[in-house]
A protein has these predicted regions:
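Nucleic-acid substrate recognition interfaces
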Residues: 1-143
Length: 143
């Protein structure tokens, strides 16, 4: 069973800029990558990774795990409808792996990978979320 918990990040201005930049860069990279997948008619995650991983990292400066997440997200979108190259909104949700580029540091801090390194951001959660927080694992989307 999937469990969804919503938390409110409380970044300062510098952290907010870093978080905004990774969201925008991720979505820009995903839109570019979708065009590559469409042009090569590549609907295979491993095939697309072989085709574009190094250029994706060099062109957009994404951390390694973020580039892999970008490839996976593009494949999910492209496989739904192969008749066009999907385009992501600049502020669309970005998936983060709780093992690689996101980690909770105590009851009220989260460490998040950005383009310039990690930022440690305070967050708030409600009673419902706090009661179920120990069960959370897997993937996180930043909206």
């Amino acid at each position: 069973m999937k469990l969804t918990l919503q938390l409110q990040l409380l970044p300062d201005d510098t952290q907010a800029d870093a978080l905004r930049s990774i969201v925008e860069r991720f979505n820009e990279a995903a839109t570019w990558l979708a065009r590559v997948a469409f042009a090569h008619q590549c609907a295979n995650k491993v095939g697309l990774q072989k085709l574009a991983y190094y250029e994706l990292r060099a062109r957009f400066g994404l951390p390694a795990d973020t580039a892999i997440r970008c490839i996976a997200q593009v494949m999910e979108a492209y496989k739904r409808d192969k008749t066009f190259a999907p385009a992501l909104r600049p502020q669309a949700a970005v998936p983060f792996s709780m093992r690689k580029n996101l980690g909770f540091k105590g009851p009220d801090w989260v460490s998040i990978q950005t383009l310039t390194g990690r930022v440690v951001v305070p967050y708030l959660m409600g009673t419902y979320q706090a009661q179920r927080f120990g069960f959370a694992h897997g993937k996180t989307d930043m909206v």
